[in-house]
Amino acid sequence: MDGIKYAVFTDKSIRLLGNNQYTSNVESGSTRTEIKHWVELFFGVKVIAMNSHRLPGKGRRMGPIMGHTMHYRRMIITLQPGYSIPPLRKKRT
């Protein structure tokens, strides 16, 4: 399982870093317990809470045909005080 796809750097996610909360996009088929176990195992941290929501795909037009991009899942991971995750690579657009 790959777990985390990439870190998310928005105004809200940068503000949440002050509360020891990290935001990232994950595989849409993964569950909270899988991601929690993967984060604790890979980074060696203690997770106390996980919030997730699924973001819808955007509409894309190719000539007369209307399509859409895939939806994805975003997790906000809260760590115990004293733990931190090193910065993840930002997705290149």
UniProtKB/Swiss-Prot annotation:
<dbReference type="GO" id="GO:0009507">
    <property type="term" value="C:chloroplast"/>
</dbReference>
<dbReference type="InterPro" id="IPR012677">
    <property type="entry name" value="Nucleotide-bd_a/b_plait_sf"/>
</dbReference>
<keyword id="KW-0687">Ribonucleoprotein</keyword>
<dbReference type="InterPro" id="IPR001014">
    <property type="entry name" value="Ribosomal_uL23_CS"/>
</dbReference>
<dbReference type="Pfam" id="PF00276">
    <property type="entry name" value="Ribosomal_L23"/>
</dbReference>
<dbReference type="GO" id="GO:0006412">
    <property type="term" value="P:translation"/>
</dbReference>
<comment type="function">
    <text>Binds to 23S rRNA.</text>
</comment>
<keyword id="KW-0934">Plastid</keyword>
<comment type="similarity">
    <text>Belongs to the universal ribosomal protein uL23 family.</text>
</comment>
<dbReference type="GO" id="GO:0019843">
    <property type="term" value="F:rRNA binding"/>
</dbReference>
<keyword id="KW-0689">Ribosomal protein</keyword>
<dbReference type="GO" id="GO:0003735">
    <property type="term" value="F:structural constituent of ribosome"/>
</dbReference>
<protein>
    <recommendedName>
        <fullName>Large ribosomal subunit protein uL23cz/uL23cy</fullName>
    </recommendedName>
</protein>
<keyword id="KW-0699">rRNA-binding</keyword>
<dbReference type="GO" id="GO:1990904">
    <property type="term" value="C:ribonucleoprotein complex"/>
</dbReference>
<comment type="subunit">
    <text>Part of the 50S ribosomal subunit.</text>
</comment>
<dbReference type="InterPro" id="IPR013025">
    <property type="entry name" value="Ribosomal_uL23-like"/>
</dbReference>
<keyword id="KW-0694">RNA-binding</keyword>
<dbReference type="InterPro" id="IPR012678">
    <property type="entry name" value="Ribosomal_uL23/eL15/eS24_sf"/>
</dbReference>
<dbReference type="GO" id="GO:0005840">
    <property type="term" value="C:ribosome"/>
</dbReference>
<keyword id="KW-0150">Chloroplast</keyword>
